[in-house]
Structures are given as C-alpha cells and as structure tokens.
Curated annotation (Swiss-Prot):
Pfam families, A to Z: Ribosomal_S7
Alphabetized GO MF terms: rRNA binding; structural constituent of ribosome; tRNA binding
Keyword flag rRNA-binding: yes
Lineage: Bacteria, Pseudomonadati, Pseudomonadota, Gammaproteobacteria, Cardiobacteriales
InterPro entries for the chain: Ribosomal_uS7, Ribosomal_uS7_bac/org-type, Ribosomal_uS7_CS, Ribosomal_uS7_dom, Ribosomal_uS7_dom_sf
Organism, as annotated: Dichelobacter nodosus (strain VCS1703A)
Keyword rRNA-binding: yes
Gene3D superfamilies referenced in this protein's UniProt entry, alphabetically: Ribosomal protein S7 domain
HAMAP family membership: Ribosomal_uS7_B
Protein name per the record: Small ribosomal subunit protein uS7
Superkingdom in the source lineage: Bacteria
Keywords, sorted A to Z: Ribonucleoprotein, Ribosomal protein, RNA-binding, rRNA-binding, tRNA-binding
Length: 156
C-alpha cells in the first residue's frame, strides 16, 4: 500500500450564472491554458443556443445530455497468470460524470462547425437525441464490457 497521503478532494464552487456545480466542472474541463472566461463564454453560449433550439432550460438540457452519455460499465485491464484480461467493472458516479463530460468535449472538438460554442451546442443536442460521437463512445464502452463479461469474476 502507498504511504503517500491521499490528495484531498477539492470541492468546486458553483458557476456564477447558473449556480450549478456541474456547469462549473464542465467549464473547468473545457478550459485551455487557464482561460476560464473564454471557456465560460463558450459553455454559456452553447447552452443558450441548444436550449433555444430544443425549447428547454439550459441546465436541464445539460443534465439530460450528460445522462445520455454516462457509462454504466467500463473495462479495466487486469493481469492474471501472464495474460491480460479486459475485466468489466461498474463505474463510480463521480467518474461517470467526468467521462461523460470528457467525451462530450472531445466529440465537440472533433466536429467541424465554425465556433466551439456551435460545436458544443450541436453535440448537446445530438446527445439528447441519443446520437453523436459522445453517445457512440458510450455504446462502444458498453459493448466492450458486454463482450468481456466472461472475465467479470476477475473483478477486484
């Protein structure tokens, strides 16, 4: 076991516009080179645009998009007797959120609309409709876990 002291979990302050911790976390994950104001602008613009298109409140749209992208299971590599197995494990709620946000941001960055706000808005809308790259990533993760179900007894 490690003798090092575990890093304390830092609590994130809610964002100024919506007063929501999830939005603040999303902004922090989107931020590049410490430019938080730019990231905030992009996220707020994306939520506003997507909310108008879908006739939904911005926060509920983000929540729903994250809900549709959250993975329930994932695979972790486990070495047993010289062979490496992909063992399916359940994903903790905090990691579910982190993965969902990471996948949404990654999918938005790989799109080719003009502005990042536009890309993010379209990715949110596609996630709510259960299509798009982020949802595909979640399905792929679930498929991997399903395919390796036989190794579930190696869980630790």
């Amino acid at each position: 076991m490690s003798r090092r002291v575990r890093a304390p979990i830092r609590h994130i302050l809610p964002d100024p516009k919506f007063g929501n911790v999830m939005v603040a976390k999303f902004v922090n994950m989107l931020m590049v080179d410490g430019k938080k104001s730019v990231a905030e602008k992009v996220v707020y613009q994306a939520l506003e645009t997507a909310g108008k298109k879908k006739n939904m409140e911005a926060i509920s749209l983000l929540e729903e998009a994250l809900d549709k992208v959250r993975p329930a299971v994932e695979v972790k590599s486990r070495r047993v007797g010289g062979a490496t197995y992909q063992v399916p494990v359940e994903v903790r709620p905090v990691r579910q959120n982190a993965l969902a946000m990471r996948w949404l941001i990654e999918a938005a960055r790989n799109r080719n609309e003009k502005s990042m706000a536009e890309r993010l808005a379209n990715e949110f809308l596609e996630a709510v409709e259960e299509r798009g790259a982020a949802v595909k990533k979640r399905d792929e993760t679930h498929r991997m876990a399903e395919a390796n179900k036989a190794f579930a007894h190696f869980r630790w």
